[in-house]
Amino acid sequence: VHTEIQLVEQQLNRIILGKPQQIRLALTCLLAEGHLLLEDLPGMGKTTLAHALAESLGLSYRRVQFTSDLLPADLTGFSIFDARSQQFSFQPGPVFSQVLLADEINRASPKTQSALLEAMEEHQVSVDGETRPLPAPFFVIATQNPLFHSGTNALPESQLDRFLIRLSLGFPDRDAELQLLQQDSSASQHKIVPALLSTERLIALQQQIPRQQISDEVLGYVLDLIGHSRKRSDMLPLSPRAAKGLVRAAKAYAFLQQRSFVTADDIQAVFPAVAEHRLQPRQQQQYAGLAQQLLLETPCLV
């Protein structure tokens, strides 16, 4: 059952070197029908990961460079009047793709950010009073630079909450970077990545995720983690949406581990990626590791 998705994972690991856990979490996000936020410095492989993921799965792919003057219609599309037919014809925007890379989303205006996040939530867009469904699967990979970079508009908490998982690829280790330097960069950029999965098969795999078993004891551990965040005065608490997302991600992660049931280890593996961007500190100063703190402070009795 899992052979195809394992082959996809192996292929991605040959393209993105030295990042097996980040690749597994990206696939977890896709299988759980969530959306992915990649936060990293420029040049760390965010675009390469998005493109390789789309090609490996045989999905249509579009990339949009977000800038301060990007308009919502540049994403969703617009209607053009045809003088010959005396009718309006709709020109679909890049949001009508199966994998959309929203590059540097925090450089766009809040209005344009909202247009994308509405499409992510509703899986449809309204243009000129007509609602148009988006293709299935619909997977957004948004990238953003750290907030200390100039020209960035921070995503508000309500919009960050729409992303199931946030990842940072980080710097490669020495061996991976040596391999990277030994590669012919021009050849590797134009290398054809074979599609290993059909769209129909991917949708079928996504439909299997809710059937994964999770015991009441493991759900109790999830509630303990979520509840502990609500007792802390130094951070914004985790919402019920975050709790549901955590369970969904853990089910997909267990599926990738070739198991039909979720363990506490699966919860712990996905919790930082699911929770960290939602655990905003109440003070102005930014600090990381809040999700890890919750894991350490919450007893696991499962």
Predicted features, each with a name:
Residues 40, 103-104, 115:
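Walker B catalytic acidic pair
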Residues 41, 75, 143:
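P-loop (Walker A) phosphate-binding loop of NTP-binding proteins
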Residues 231-302:
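C-terminal engagement/docking regions of AAA+ P-loop ATPases
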Residues 25-28, 81-101:
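Conserved alpha-helical scaffold flanking the Walker A/P-loop in AAA+ ATPase domains
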Residues 82-87, 108, 112, 120-197, ...:
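Canonical AAA+ ATPase core
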Residues 27-67:
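Walker A/P-loop
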Residues 56-84:
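AAA+/P-loop NTPase substrate/partner-engagement loops
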Residues 2-44:
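Pre-Walker A (pre-P-loop) alpha-helix and adjacent loop at the N terminus of AAA/AAA+ ATPase modules
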